[in-house]
Swiss-Prot record:
Compartments reported by the entry: Nucleus, Nucleolus; Nucleus, Nucleoplasm
Role played: Required for maturation of ribosomal RNAs and formation of the large ribosomal subunit.
Domain of life, per lineage: Eukaryota
GO molecular function, one term: ribonucleoprotein complex binding
PANTHER family named among the record's database cross-references: RIBOSOME BIOGENESIS PROTEIN BOP1, RIBOSOME BIOGENESIS PROTEIN BOP1 BLOCK OF PROLIFERATION 1 PROTEIN
Name recorded for this polypeptide: Ribosome biogenesis protein BOP1 homolog
Record SMART domains: BOP1NT, WD40
Taxonomic lineage of the native organism: Eukaryota, Metazoa, Ecdysozoa, Nematoda, Chromadorea
Residue stretches of each WD repeat: 342-384, 386-425, 427-458, 459-500, 503-541, 587-626, 643-674
UniProt organism field: Caenorhabditis elegans
Composition bias type Basic and acidic residues, residue spans: 15-28
């Protein structure tokens, strides 16, 4: 038992006697009291290394609450409590910052203190406050804005009442005190002592003579509701010269007018009175129809219904579309670079080499075809034709130096320009030599024959236009005359020609091939028809809205047609949207002679006989969500009018640069650059 009691720890029991707490007593293992006195332990001295700070790092900046940027140009950031300057700490380089970011685990919780120029490490409490502010919570840590609510009154409906005491008898017996009070009041009324409430004196309301009629200070709700739906009566017409007491002579009726006025019905009279003339105002008698007219006006105001007309007050400038800044739509041609002179007479057609755009071919009224260097503007070669040139077109194949020329005398010539890469020139010579012009059928309408460096096609009629297919083997020609067989399609590799149309559908003005498909667009005076050459069927008939089409062009994908007319109109046909124009513009004052769309840039140009070339920013979107964009950006002038009112006859774009080239009736070719 002794060992057991020795193993038991000392117990300290609390005993209370008479509500007082006894002091603690400790006993040993034999039950004897131990006398233990409290010992005062001195506090442990603070370790100087627990607070890791030096005198230099513990400086306090005493500049106060002023912008720290005032010290940007100084070599210090302020002053300490002794008035000494606090030097700026050395700035860390990018390498030191990167190493500290990688090696210091507490880098993310350090912020830069502008007052001391050092990084301060945030505590956990500060970080938690910042997190609460960033997440939209209360900055105070542990704050709960939604404390539990203690509902004092129970929401449960009880059957039994809380207090079930019976009602006292006094509740059912009339009160004697109230009876005595009522009897006193009755006696006072009988004796005349009790007096009722005094009547309030009505205040005198003075009428404000100068108040506005529209004032709403003392208006009732019913009056206000009537005022909202009130329609003011039309005002009486102002008097005219005929109602004057001394009107001019032309207002006085003669005998014929007087008789006509008297015989006319009252409703048919222009004036409901007969003008009179007096020498002085004092001689004017009383108006005999005054009461009648006022009565009729009262009837009109009372019986005639009124109608409220809503007028839209809109600023005309708000109805105009918002146009972008032309500087944001660059590049586009703005400046005349130089002229190319050499033709005598009109320059009717021009075309540019399709690959690099180094060469330009032009055909004129003087019967010459000239090859120009675009970079220098010099003529490097000239071909003399037997008639006036009406159309020229470079072959779209890059490795061929072929040029199709239509000129008067019912001829179409395929020339080898002999300019450019020597290998391409030799390949073109071999191609022309291999063309089977001898294997022609007897009685052919179009005859092919070779003549030195060119192929000659004898046409049945004068040719207006010649154009190539994108693959370079087929080209089409259009006759000037209004006949059924005005369009011919020629195949260069087989030296054959055929007329795809046997019936006359209208006077054909221009044709062009689809860039990617075997289709042909044929433009008459007012319509454009799209034919499928593979199936020989009509695909679509377009209603252009032009009275007389003069030119036609397509974009690189063949999904849009651009038309110009002699009626000064320019039409943009979006083939995916329907058979009607998407845009119709009339920016020219004379006939539109040519339209061209750039292959690389969203640029469109039209030239006219008014001596101007309109440059448009024409953005075509393949996405059906976005609509096409068309903005006029520049109007160019370079040519002079001739006596027959002709000016700009043709235009084309450089294939790789935003340069515009125009041909004029004054015998010059103009190049516009940006």
């Amino acid at each position: 038992m002794a060992s057991t009691s020795a193993a038991t720890p000392l117990k300290n029991k609390r005993k209370f006697e008479n509500g007082k707490k006894k002091p603690k007593t400790l006993k040993d293992e034999f039950g004897e009291k131990l006398d233990i006195k409290p010992v005062i332990v001195p506090p442990k001295p603070a370790d100087e290394y627990d607070y890791d700070s030096s005198d230099e790092e513990d400086l306090r900046n005493t500049i106060g609450n002023i912008p720290i940027k005032w010290y940007d140009d100084e070599d210090h950031i302020g002053y300490d409590k002794f008035g000494e300057k606090i030097a700026k700490p050395a700035k860390k380089g990018e390498i030191e910052t990167f190493l500290e970011k990688m090696e210091d685990p507490d880098y993310w919780r350090k912020v830069f203190d502008k007052q001391t120029g050092t990084d301060v490490k945030l505590t956990d409490e500060q970080i938690e406050k910042i997190h609460n502010i960033a997440t939209g919570k209360y900055p105070t840590i542990g704050y709960n804005p939604y404390e539990p609510f203690l509902d004092i009154f129970s929401s449960q409906k009880e059957i039994h009442p809380i207090d079930n005491r019976p009602e006292p008898k006094s509740r059912f017996i009339p009160s004697k005190d109230e009876m005595r009070m009522v009897s006193r009041m009755v006696h006072a009324i009988k004796m005349g002592w009790a007096k009722g409430p005094r009547a309030k004196k009505e205040e005198h309301k003075s009428y404000d003579l100068w108040a506005s009629e529209d004032a709403l200070d003392n208006v009732t709700k019913s009056q206000l509701s009537r005022m909202r739906v009130h329609m003011p009566a039309p005002k009486v017409a102002l008097p005219t010269h005929a109602e004057s007491y001394n009107p001019p002579e032309e207002y006085i009726f003669d005998d014929e007018e007087r008789k006509k006025w008297e015989e006319a019905e009252k409703e048919d009279r222009v004036l409901n009175f007969m003008p009179s003339k007096y020498d002085a105002l004092r001689k004017v008698p009383q108006y005999d129809k005054f009461i009648t007219e006022r009565f009729e006006r009262c009837l009109d105001l009372y019986l005639a219904p009124r109608q409220r007309k809503m007028r839209i007050h809109a600023d005309p400038t708000d109805l105009l579309p918002d146009l972008p800044n032309p500087n944001d739509l660059r590049p586009f041609p703005t400046t005349l670079a130089f002229y190319m002179r050499g033709h005598t007479g009109q320059v009717r057609a021009i075309t540019v080499e399709p690959e690099r755009g180094e060469l330009l071919a032009s055909g004129g009224e003087d019967g010459t075809v000239r090859i120009w260097m675009i970079a220098t503007g010099r003529c490097i070669k000239t071909f003399q034709m037997d008639g006036e040139v009406t159309s020229v077109s470079f072959s779209p194949v890059a490795d061929r130096t072929l040029l199709a020329v239509a000129y008067e005398g019912k001829y179409v010539a395929i020339l080898n320009t002999g300019c450019g890469d020597r290998l391409h020139v030799q390949q073109t010579e071999a191609l022309l030599a291999e063309t089977p012009t001898d294997a022609q059928e007897d009685g052919a309408v179009v005859t092919w024959r070779k003549s030195k460096e060119k192929l000659m096609l004898k046409m049945p009629n004068e040719v207006r236009q010649v154009t190539w297919h994108s693959k370079g083997d087929y080209f089409a020609s259009v006759a000037i005359d209004d006949i059924a067989k005005s369009v011919y399609v020629h195949q260069l590799s087989k030296a054959k020609s055929q007329c795809p149309f046997q019936k006359r559908k209208g006077h054909v003005q221009a044709v062009t091939f689809h860039p990617t498909q075997a289709r042909l667009f044929v433009a008459t005076k007012i319509h454009v028809r799209e034919y499928d050459l593979a199936r020989c069927v009509l695909v679509k008939k377009l209603i252009t809205g032009c009275k007389h089409i003069s030119t036609m062009a397509t974009d690189a994908n063949g999904e849009n047609l651009f038309l110009g007319g002699l009626d000064r109109r320019f039409c943009w046909m979006d083939l995916q949207m329907g058979n009607k124009p998407w845009k119709k513009l009339k920016h020219h004052t004379a006939a539109v002679r040519s339209v061209a769309y750039h292959k690389k840039y969203p640029l469109l140009a039209t030239v006219s006989d008014d001596g101007t070339a309109m440059v448009y920013y024409a953005r075509i979107y393949t996405d059906f969500v976005k609509d096409n964009e068309l903005y006029p950006v520049k109007r160019l002038r370079a040519h002079e009018k001739t006596p027959n009112d002709l000016c700009m006859l043709h235009t084309t774009w450089h294939p790789t640069q935003p340069w515009l080239i125009t041909a004029g009736a004054d015998g010059t070719i103009a190049l516009f650059t940006y």
